[in-house]
């Protein structure tokens, strides 16, 4: 409830001029020592950390201390049967099990303000489990970013029914980690930001991705696009759902 009213306050206090805004989430943090390289990126990048991983808790704590926004990268069952890793949610779990898993994972990753799904092409299609996930997130006053690993996702309807703040991933930046592949997606990010005003993109802590972003993130500012922590886009999303139409963009 407090988070909801905080977002309302942000909406009504939006300045009269705002730039196109982009949130970039770096997923899959926690297993590799090289993941720490994500902290070489600007602190407006959001880090999504896998629970119960060897380095996840330490990286989350260090990143928070350096001003990064932290999310929980919550493992969910996929259609292809790929192993979820510890803390995963599967379709054979009951309500108590799902809620307990979500709560424990949020506790494991310190300073997590929200969560997004790791895999989940099966689980996010199911109304009941996603409703339980959102109930748990609401209890912890956390937002959710739907990674959209299936077009049939029910995350949005579950979140809306409970008033859980939600965003949707609109672009994956690094399915192809060649320079050409990264450049293609980065140009698409800029184009989408100009067209839509706000974009949520997901990338991963691959060495190629980190190098590319370090070199190319300044292009956003040159294009009049502001890189922001993910939660900064929630008020705009809420305003659109409530029928409000901000007339200008944040500087």
Specify the residue positions occupied by each region the protein language model found.
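Sec-dependent N-terminal signal peptides
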Residues: 3-15
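Catalytic-site microenvironment of enzymes
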Residues: 4, 18-251
